[in-house]
């Protein structure tokens, strides 16, 4: 999908991803009863001279209309999508994790920048 400064691609998703997170580091946040981790894999390419990017502009929304923010502290998982700067044509790819209610359906990944329009991606069922 095209945003003013970026091309954003949803490369894949894994649900549940709780075992991935908990096996990576015993100190990662354990989801509350009735919740689970979802992992999305995203690629972001800069379309202008220079971009500052953060994965914290992504969130997940499902059938219950609840907005789930990304988990900030997930340790021990290789390939996390990290904040940083890119020059035109540069790409950052990686994983972002969310804790969502089990049974929540129709998950959508939302790119919600401070300035500009939101972009939505259907998260495939896995």
Residue ranges and their predicted role:
Residues 1-39, 43-126:
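Conserved functional micro-motifs across diverse proteins
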């Amino acid at each position: 999908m095209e945003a003013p400064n970026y091309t954003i691609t949803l490369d894949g998703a894994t649900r549940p991803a709780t075992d991935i997170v908990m096996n990576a580091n015993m100190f990662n946040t354990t989801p509350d009863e009735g919740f689970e981790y979802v992992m999305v894999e995203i690629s972001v390419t800069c379309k202008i001279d220079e971009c500052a990017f953060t994965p914290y502009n992504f969130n997940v929304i499902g059938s219950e209309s609840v907005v789930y923010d990304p988990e900030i502290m997930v340790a021990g998982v290789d390939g996390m999508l990290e904040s940083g700067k890119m020059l035109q044509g540069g790409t950052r790819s990686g994983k972002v994790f969310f804790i969502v209610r089990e049974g929540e359906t129709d998950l959508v990944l939302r790119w919600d920048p401070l300035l500009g329009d939101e972009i939505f991606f259907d998260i495939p069922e896995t």
